[in-house]
């Protein structure tokens, strides 16, 4: 396991970089929820429902 390949894309060993990438991703997202809180709310609900496959409880 000492041979890590493609270090540039490995966030597991570089949490700070992963955090930066997350912030950048949020800023550059195509759908701007700042101007449309209603849409942001709907997206949140959809995301919660469709995550983790089957949870029909």
From Swiss-Prot:
Q: Where along the chain is composition biased (Basic and acidic residues)?
A: 12-23, 36-45
Q: Name one GO biological process term.
A: cell adhesion involved in single-species biofilm formation
This protein's source sits in the domain of life called: Bacteria
User: What InterPro entries does the database record attribute to this sequence?
Assistant: Stress-induced_KGG_rpt
Question: Residue ranges of region Disordered?
Answer: 1-57
Give the Basic residues compositional bias ranges: 46-57
Q: Can you tell me which family this protein belongs to? A: Belongs to the con-10 family.
UniProt-recorded name of the protein: Uncharacterized protein YmdF
């Amino acid at each position: 396991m000492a041979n890590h390949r493609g270090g540039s894309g490995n966030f597991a060993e570089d949490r700070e970089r992963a955090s930066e990438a997350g912030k950048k991703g949020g800023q550059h997202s195509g759908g701007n929820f700042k101007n449309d809180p209603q849409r942001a709310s709907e997206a949140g609900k959809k995301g919660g429902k469709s995550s983790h496959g089957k949870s029909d409880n």
